[in-house]
Regions:
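Gly/Ser/Thr-rich beta-alpha loop segments that engage phosphate groups in nucleotides
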Residues: 19-22, 135-136, 159, 166-170
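A conserved FAD-binding loop/helix module that cradles the flavin
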Residues: 161-185
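Domain-scale detector for complete catalytic domains at protein termini or as standalone homologs
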Residues: 32, 39-41, 68-76, 81, ...
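N-terminal low-complexity, intrinsically disordered patches enriched in charged
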Residues: 26-29, 142-143, 177
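An anion/pyrophosphate-binding glycine-rich loop and adjacent beta-alpha core
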Residues: 1, 5-99
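Predominant activation on well-ordered alpha-helical scaffold segments within soluble catalytic domains
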Residues: 23-24, 106-109, 113, 175-183
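A glycine-rich dinucleotide-binding beta-alpha-beta segment and adjacent secondary-structure elements
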Residues: 83-163
Length: 185
């Protein structure tokens, strides 16, 4: 497997899939994707090294030693993630924490540090935050934003084939190109 993009940032699990700044930025690298070709691997505990996470798991399992495994992860994960992580770990939900083996803990740690999600497609264009494509910047005078092909025709913003990562960059492109076009009309 080849890593196309590695990033750190915020991510949302939604009713339709993954979203948030990290996913929006990564999607630009997958625009020509074939369904099922990409897998996103998430580190659900990026602030912890594997060793630190193992120590945390040991501490939490000891603290909850008489509880069912599925009821012991509420300080580690959001409530809605717990059943998914439990299922992927292969540890029976009703297993008591004090019976979980080192091998089971290693599988759990791997699930937390390498949580995979297969990307099956993009959300519809109607829900897009940023789109790629448009008028080629090679066909536009960058000082005036006037078309090199049709005098008197000006372009600004998302009509241009320019896209950027989230964080206001697309707004800056829109403002700057709009200003340049407006100043040269």
């Amino acid at each position: 497997e080849m890593c196309i993009r590695d990033s750190f940032g915020e991510l949302l699990f939604t009713h339709f899939g993954l979203s948030g700044p990290t996913i929006l930025s990564a999607s630009a690298h997958m625009r020509h994707m074939a369904p099922g070709r990409y897998t996103v691997t998430l580190d659900l505990k990026p602030a912890l090294t594997p060793e630190q996470l193992d120590q945390r798991l040991l501490r939490d399992l000891e603290k909850n030693k008489n509880r069912n495994f599925s009821n012991s992860l509420d300080e580690l994960l959001p409530q809605k993630m717990i059943p998914v992580v439990v299922r992927r770990s292969g540890i029976p939900p009703e297993e008591k924490c004090n019976t979980i083996t080192r091998e089971q803990r290693a599988v759990l740690l791997n699930v937390l540090k390498h949580f995979t999600v297969e990307i099956s497609g993009f959300a519809p264009l109607s829900g897009a935050i940023v789109t790629a494509g448009g008028v080629s910047v090679k066909e536009v005078d960058p000082k005036t934003m006037q078309s090199k092909l049709i005098p008197g025709l000006y372009f600004a913003g998302e009509i241009l084939d320019v896209d950027a990562y989230t964080g206001g960059f697309n707004l800056q492109i829109a403002f700057a190109t709009g200003h340049a076009a407006g100043e040269n009309l």
